[in-house]
């Protein structure tokens, strides 16, 4: 082993996970291919629309949620705990529950469904990227992930954890 290879961290096997829907078009997909397509396995936890999306042809795993079923989001939350029903139902957080506006419940449900499916896979990945299909990737940089760590973008100052891009072990 050369001294240079000792200085380089071992390559981490990566699963690139897309949640939500595949509305982004060709530009985000092509930027994914250019920056990560050869180095990551692709996983989709998405709605059942956009069946002709190129993301589907490249994915190793595809888990779909039937977006036409108005109760699928409630059933997903109930699978975790029915306690959520006792809390105030604020628009943008619990939408589309009981006709409320917003999509907070939807994106959290996609995260939950992704989790439920990932824990069934063999432990072959060192790193997981969580993002959406409507983002353009300008770099192939992914941080080397330490066990028990989650990396999220800095500088957005929104005070929470984003669904737009994070990397974890």
Which residues does each predicted region cover?
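ER/Golgi luminal nucleotide-sugar-dependent glycosyltransferases, focusing on the catalytic module
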Residues: 2-169
């Amino acid at each position: 082993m050369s001294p240079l290879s000792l200085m380089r961290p071992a390559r981490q096997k990566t699963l690139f996970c897309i949640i939500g829907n595949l509305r982004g078009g060709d530009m985000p997909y092509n930027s994914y291919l250019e920056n990560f397509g050869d180095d990551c396995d692709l996983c989709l936890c998405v709605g059942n629309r956009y069946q002709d999306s190129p993301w589907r042809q490249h994915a190793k795993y595809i888990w779909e949620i039937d977006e036409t079923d108005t109760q699928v989001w409630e059933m997903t939350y109930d699978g975790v705990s029915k306690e959520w029903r006792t809390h105030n139902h604020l628009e943008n957080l619990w939408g589309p529950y009981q006709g409320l506006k917003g999509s907070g419940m939807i994106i959290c449900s996609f995260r939950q469904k992704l989790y439920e499916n990932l824990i069934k896979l063999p432990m072959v990945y060192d790193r997981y990227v969580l993002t959406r299909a409507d983002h353009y990737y300008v770099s192939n940089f992914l941080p080397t992930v330490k066990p028990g760590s989650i990396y999220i973008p800095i500088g957005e100052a929104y005070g929470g954890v984003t669904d737009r891009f994070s990397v974890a072990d």
